[in-house]
């Protein structure tokens, strides 16, 4: 009967933890040996600079609380260059036909924001162009916003569109005495 309860305890996780601690020591020893071999390989390859982990990598490699002393791990990570050179480019495009839509999508794929002015196109081709570019924007996890009649803003996933600007402008307008009109159709306030 006691063996049944000990099996239940082991299954639930209330069993004797000493068995698991012994296994952990074996794995640590194997891991240390693999680490030494990896460091030796890097040193012979001449990439000793890549063997020093960053602070973020050290923090993420720390052992969980209660598992004993924290161990440092050295990872062989790949550094991926970011294509953005710090300059965000916004293109204003006024296409004349649907055939220009793939070029617009290519700009989005190149991580450039596009303001699309479709007022020069007939309505059927304009609708077709918007559908095409909107579908491509969705496919690359981009964002879109209608700015005005026939004018749309399409951005890649690295650019977020915020519609909070009007409330910020209202606050700034109130801070300067409320003399600026945010809505051109709104009647002007009399200056007092």
Curated annotation (Swiss-Prot):
GO terms (BP aspect): division septum assembly; FtsZ-dependent cytokinesis
The UniProt regions of compositional bias labelled Low complexity, in chain numbering, are 43-63
Location comes to: Cytoplasm
Q: Name one Pfam family in it.
A: SepF
Q: Where is the composition biased (Acidic residues)?
A: 18-28
Where is this chain compositionally biased, Basic and acidic residues type?
Answer: 29-42
Domain of life, per lineage: Bacteria
Keywords on record: Cell cycle, Cell division, Cytoplasm, Septation
Q: Do you know which InterPro entries this protein is assigned to? A: Cell_div_SepF, Cell_div_SepF/SepF-rel, SepF-like_sf
Coarsely, its chief localization is: cytoplasm
GO cellular-component terms in the record? cytoplasm
From the UniProt entry, list the residue stretches annotated as the region Disordered.
15-70
UniProt similarity note = Belongs to the SepF family.
How this chain assembles, per its entry, is: Homodimer. Interacts with FtsZ.
Chain's role = Cell division protein that is part of the divisome complex and is recruited early to the Z-ring. Probably stimulates Z-ring formation, perhaps through the cross-linking of FtsZ protofilaments. Its function overlaps with FtsA.
The entry's protein name is: Cell division protein SepF
Gene encoding this polypeptide? sepF
């Amino acid at each position: 009967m006691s063996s049944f309860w000990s099996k239940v305890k082991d299954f639930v996780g209330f069993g004797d933890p000493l068995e698991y601690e012994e296994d952990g020591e074996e794995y640590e020893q194997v891991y240390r040996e693999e680490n030494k071999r990896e460091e030796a390989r890097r040193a012979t390859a001449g990439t000793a600079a890549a063997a020093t982990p960053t602070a973020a990598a050290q923090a993420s490699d720390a052992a969980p609380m209660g598992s004993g002393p924290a161990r440092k791990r050295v990872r062989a990570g790949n550094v991926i260059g970011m294509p953005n050179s710090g300059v965000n480019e916004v293109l204003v495009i006024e296409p004349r036909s649907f055939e220009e839509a793939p070029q617009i999508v290519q700009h989005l794929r190149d991580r450039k924001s596009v303001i699309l002015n479709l007022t020069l196109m007939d309505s059927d081709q304009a609708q077709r162009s918007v559908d095409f570019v909107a579908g491509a924007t969705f496919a690359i996890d981009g964002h879109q916003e209608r700015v005005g009649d026939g004018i749309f803003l399409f951005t890649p996933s690295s650019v977020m569109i915020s519609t909070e600007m009007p409330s910020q402008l209202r606050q700034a307008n109130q801070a300067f005495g409320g003399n600026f009109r945010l809505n051109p159709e709104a009647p002007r306030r009399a200056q007092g």
